[in-house]
């Protein structure tokens, strides 16, 4: 394990991934010139816009736009919505069944826990979890924002490690994830996730006045947390943020994909991009952790949806242009063998951020899901130690 060290070696190939499942789209260097690619992208984008206008006009003026066809379309939408609502009910029931405490050999309960629903920024129901020390006041709170396609219940072990050290833990399932509302694996906007985090922070501050609060985000959740920290009204509520394997730099499968992604995300936002459904990249060196993840019915394992992929590209572009604006105390952790997100981007964050209090951990040979690696307890202890040191700095 290294502190503040770089990751050696360049790569001729990058990956775009769905984050939680390790599905990838290879990113190859283009053989075309930059100017040629730009011209081609503009031409393709223009063509798509004209096609959209043509289809829209025919749809409005054509014979299909009859009362009977509209009624049929309405029935299809209602059936689709009913199926989505049924899936949400199924997932919420599964989320309630997730084990919230580990077996204690001595039969003692050192943690109290609860699950609850919070109305999100758009009145969507957010499924949340709480773990807290059973016999002591919380000396701090960590809010966990999971990665793409997973859910908050996976962080039980780390949560109990935190409560043992006197920290309370809140965790929220994103929209379209775990027990929260929304189509499974579909994220209309990662800005919605930021707004929902703000709603949860309101509740936490109201219930725990004066208790210092940290945010932790994993993978795409790390990108969301980093962007959230750039908003002053969120930044002022936090003592610091922790980022594990953050998705800061993500490239599309081809430059043209980046050019047309905004259009496709509007035309067919929920379409599943099966070309990205490639398996084989391990995210942990612990076989038991991999088995638990991919056999979990609350982990989305289908192809990434078009709008979701576009949102990842969008937040990545935003962050890369705003690293110098980061001022919040932060700790970033990354495995050097991570093939899902780029450890070099974490190094860039550490180098460019304006934060006075910043720390970095690079773990030689470790993979993407750091809190599910065999050394998870050591990594968790380093995070807790960083929070302790940050709190001491605030009192100086």
Residue ranges and their predicted role:
Residues 357, 361-396:
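Catalytic active-site module of serine/aspartate enzymes centered on a nucleophile-bearing elbow/loop
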């Amino acid at each position: 394990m290294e502190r503040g060290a770089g990751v050696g070696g360049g790569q001729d190939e990058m990956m775009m991934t769905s984050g939680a499942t390790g599905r990838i789209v290879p990113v190859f260097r283009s053989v075309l010139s930059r100017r040629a690619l730009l011209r081609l992208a503009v031409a393709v984008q223009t063509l798509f816009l004209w096609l959209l206008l043509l289809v829209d006009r025919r749809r409005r003026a054509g014979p299909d736009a009859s009362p009977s066809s509209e009624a049929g379309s309405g029935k299809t939408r209602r059936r689709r919505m009913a199926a989505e609502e049924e899936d949400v009910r199924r997932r919420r029931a599964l989320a309630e069944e997730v084990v919230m405490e580990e077996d204690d050999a001595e039969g003692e309960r050192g943690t109290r826990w609860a699950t609850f629903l919070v109305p999100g920024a758009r009145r969507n129901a957010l499924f949340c979890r709480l773990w807290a020390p059973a016999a002591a006041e919380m000396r701090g709170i960590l809010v966990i924002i999971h990665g793409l396609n997973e859910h908050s219940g996976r962080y039980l072990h780390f949560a109990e490690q935190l409560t043992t050290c006197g920290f309370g833990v809140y965790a929220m399932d994103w929209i379209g994830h775990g027990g929260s509302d929304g189509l499974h694996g579909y994220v209309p906007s990662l800005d919605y996730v930021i707004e929902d985090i703000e709603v949860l922070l309101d509740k936490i501050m109201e219930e725990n006045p004066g208790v210092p609060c940290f945010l932790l985000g994993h993978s795409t959740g790390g990108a969301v947390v980093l962007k959230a920290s750039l908003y002053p009204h969120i930044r002022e509520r936090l003592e610091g943020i922790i980022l594990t394997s953050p998705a800061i730099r993500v490239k599309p499968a081809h430059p043209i994909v980046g050019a047309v992604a905004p259009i496709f995300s509007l035309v067919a936002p929920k379409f599943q991009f099966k070309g990205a459904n490639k398996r084989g990249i391990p995210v942990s060196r612990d076989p038991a952790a991999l088995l638990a993840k991919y056999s979990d019915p609350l982990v989305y394992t289908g192809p990434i949806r078009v709008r979701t992929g576009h949102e990842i590209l969008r937040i990545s572009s935003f962050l890369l242009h705003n690293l110098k604006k980061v001022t919040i105390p932060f700790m970033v952790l990354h495995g050097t063998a991570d093939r899902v997100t780029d450890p070099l981007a974490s190094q860039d964050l550490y180098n460019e951020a304006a934060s006075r209090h910043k720390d970095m951990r690079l773990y030689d040979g470790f993979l993407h899901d750091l809190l599910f690696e065999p050394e998870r307890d050591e990594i968790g202890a380093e995070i807790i130690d960083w929070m302790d040191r940050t709190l001491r700095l605030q009192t100086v």
